[in-house]
Design a protein with these regions (language model features):
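Acidic, polar-rich low-complexity tracts and alpha-helical solenoid repeat scaffolds
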Residues: 1-182
C-alpha cells in the first residue's frame, strides 16, 4: 500500500471520528485506525489506545469480537502475555466465543509450558464438534505438541526454542527469533 493511500485511509477514519458523534460507526472507525497502527505502522502502543477506544464505544458484535482478538494480538506484540491472558479471561466471562478461546490457547502456547497448553487443547476439543471450523486447527496443535514435545529430549528442547522464536516473531523481534533458533 502506498503512503498516499495509507494517509488517505487514516484521514478518512479520523474525519469519521470528528463528524459522526455518537454513531455506531465510531467503534468501527477506532477499530480500523487501530488495525492500521498494528498491521501497517506497527505502532503497538497507539494501536492499543485506539482499539481500547473502540471497545468503549459500544461496538456491534462483529466489531467487538474483532477488536477483542486484535487487542490480544497487540498485547502479544508488546510482550504483555500475562495481560493478554487476563484480558481474554475477562472477555470469556461475558462471551463464550470459540475464537476468543482459541486466542487464549495461543497466548498460553506462547507463554506457558506445552503441558499446560495441551490440557487447554484437550479441554477445547471436548467442547468442539468435528464440523466446527476450528476443530482441525486445535487437532493440528495437539498433534504438533504430541509429536515434538512429548518425544525425546532433543526434540523437546528444539520445540521450546521454536515456541520462544514464535513469540519473538509476534513481537517483531526478528533478530531474537533467529538467535533462538541457532
Amino acid at each position: 500500500i502506498s503512503t498516499d493511500n495509507l494517509s488517505s485511509s487514516i484521514a478518512l477514519y479520523d474525519s469519521m471520528l470528528v463528524t459522526l458523534d455518537r454513531s455506531p460507526l465510531i467503534a468501527e472507525a477506532f477499530f480500523k485506525l487501530g488495525e492500521i497502527q498494528y498491521r501497517m505502522l506497527q505502532d503497538f502502543d497507539k494501536a492499543y489506545i485506539l482499539l481500547s477506544k473502540a471497545m468503549k464505544n459500544k461496538p456491534n458484535k462483529k466489531v467487538r469480537l474483532n477488536t477483542t482478538l486484535r487487542i490480544a494480538d497487540v498485547l502479544i506484540a508488546r510482550g504483555e502475555l500475562d495481560e493478554a491472558k487476563s484480558f481474554l479471561a475477562r472477555q470469556l466471562k461475558s462471551n463464550q466465543i470459540p475464537t476468543i478461546e482459541l486466542k487464549k490457547i495461543l497466548v498460553h502456547f506462547l507463554d506457558d509450558d506445552p503441558d499446560t497448553t495441551l490440557n487447554m487443547v484437550n479441554s477445547a476439543l471436548l467442547k468442539l464438534t468435528p464440523v466446527n471450523p476450528f476443530f482441525n486447527d486445535i487437532m493440528e496443535l495437539k498433534n504438533l505438541i504430541n509429536k515434538y514435545y512429548d518425544s525425546n529430549q532433543q526434540n523437546r528442547s528444539a520445540f521450546i526454542h521454536f515456541i520462544k522464536a514464535e513469540n519473538y516473531l509476534r513481537q517483531k523481534k526478528l533478530g531474537d527469533a533467529m538467535q533462538e533458533l541457532l
